[in-house]
């Protein structure tokens, strides 16, 4: 299982390995889901909410995204596809 920090900054996969944006991880890994969303890092914030499995965090990300994008999406919107975030079981991490 990936750590929270590796999961939220995963930019893709190469076979059984997650490819992680090391620069973004170093800069933003300590931020909460709310702080990531407030900074406009919606993909990372969404990933963090998915990783935590906390519905309140997911609602917070959606509300912050809607305010920034002037949209009115709810949980039924396919945010997984929008942000390209899908939980995947991998054990290896490659940091770029």
PLM features: residue spans?
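Extended alpha-helical solenoid/arm regions of large eukaryotic scaffolding proteins
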Residues: 1-96
């Amino acid at each position: 299982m990936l750590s929270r920090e590796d999961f939220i900054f995963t930019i893709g996969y190469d076979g059984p390995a997650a490819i992680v944006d090391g620069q973004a991880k170093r800069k933003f890994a300590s931020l909460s889901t709310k702080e990531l969303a407030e900074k406009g890092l919606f993909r990372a914030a969404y990933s963090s909410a998915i990783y935590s499995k906390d519905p309140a965090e997911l609602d917070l990300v959606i509300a912050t995204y809607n305010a920034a994008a002037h949209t009115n999406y709810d949980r039924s919107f396919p945010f997984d596809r929008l942000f390209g975030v899908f939980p995947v079981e991998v054990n290896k991490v490659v940091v770029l």
